[in-house]
Amino acid sequence: MDAITCIKTRRSIRKFKSDAVSAEDIKDIVLTASYAPSWKNTQTTRYIAITDPELKNRISKECCGEHNQEIIDNAPMLVATTIIDKRSGFERDGSYTTVREDNWQAFDNGIATQTFCLAAHEKGLGTVIMGMYDIDKAAEILEVPEGQLLMALIGVGYPDEQPDVPKKKTVEDLLKFR
């Protein structure tokens, strides 16, 4: 599928079939996501693929509200994205490179996460990015290494729904020429 079609047809999927997601597919998706641009090519995003039902259940029940619990319980795989802290947007001495301070880390992770989701869509997998959960508790459960920060949880699986295209803003609302 071409890039424009992939971008325009990807939807957030919240209902999944029970079919397992292969390790090879996830490896291919992460490889593709590694091509996402990042600050000075720091490539700070890391991925944790979670298929262990007990681990998924703990994250669902101990870290999430009801809506995200349903998604995680239904998804055959949960992927957590982390970043290596204090690299993206920082100088070697630890000072900020830009006025955005440490926010650049989230920007880079967002680019990598979107690229991950597009690569998954190209393989016929659905994804939904979740940001509302107890980050500290989830990081503890996942044993996120020291020096990394947990950023997002992504439900991954074969879609069991075909959501409509959500209403989009007009180009006139989004773009200004000066």
What positions do the PLM features span?
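C-terminal helix-cap and adjacent tail motif
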Residues: 3-13, 18, 87, 92, ...
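A glycine-rich helix N-cap at a beta->alpha junction
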Residues: 68-78, 143-165
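Small-aliphatic-rich amphipathic alpha-helix that forms the alpha element of a beta-alpha
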Residues: 33-34, 79, 97-141
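Glycine/small-residue-rich phosphate/adenosyl-binding loop
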Residues: 41-109
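A structural motif
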Residues: 26-34
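Short secondary-structure boundary segments
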Residues: 83, 132, 158
